[in-house]
Amino acid sequence: FDRVREILSGNPRFQKIHALKPVTLDVKKGEVLGVIGQNGAGKSTLLKVLARTLLPSTGEIEINGRVAALLELGASFHPEMTGHENVYLSCAIQGLSSQEIDSVYGEIVAFAEIGEFIHRPVKTYSSGMFVRLAFAIATHIDPEILIIDEALSVGDGAFSRKSFDRIMDFKNAGKTILFCSHSMYQVEALCDRVVWLEAGAVKKIGEPVE
C-alpha cells in the first residue's frame, strides 16, 4: 500500500535521474563524430542538447555555423500541414529565404521520393516517409553542421544506402557531422572519432577501430 499512500499524501518518492552527466567535448570543423552506446545511454539527449532542441540544466555549449538536425521522427513537422508546406516551414525556420527555398524545393522532393504524398498532410505518412522527407530537407539546406540520430535505421535498404552516400558527400565536402547509429559498420566507414556513452557519461573517446 506504499504506492497508494504516496498518491493520497501527495508526497511521491521519485528518484532524480541525470539523463546526461557532465560532458566535455570538442568537435573540430570538418570532423565526423560518431556517438554510440546502449539504449538509454544518453545518445539522443546529447544530440538534442547540441542541436539546441533541449536546454542543458548546467554547462555551456558553443556552436559555430548553421545546424541541421534529424532527431525524433517527424518532430519538426506540423502534422496537419502537407509535405509541401512543411518543406517551406522547415527551411524558413532554418533561415532560408523564399527564393532559396524555391531553388532547393525540387531537389528535396526528388530526393525524398514520396511522390504525390508531398501534397498530403504528413500525419498520413508512414515512418519511412517521415524520415525520407526530413532527411531530404536536412541535407539540402546547406548546413555547416549535420546532426543525425538513427535516421538510417528507418525505411528501406535502398533509401538507407542513398542517404549514407549523401552523408559521405557531406563528409567529403568538409562538413561537420555528428552521427548516432547502432551500426558499427556505418560508424567505422564514416566517423573520424567515436564517443562511447554509458549511463549518461562518456566512457571513452577514440577512433572507431579501437
Language-model region placement:
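Conserved ABC ATPase "signature" C-loop
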Residues: 199-200
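Conserved catalytic segment of ABC-fold P-loop ATPases
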Residues: 189-196
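Conserved ABC ATPase "signature" region
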Residues: 2-8, 88, 100-117, 134-136
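Conserved H-loop
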Residues: 183-189
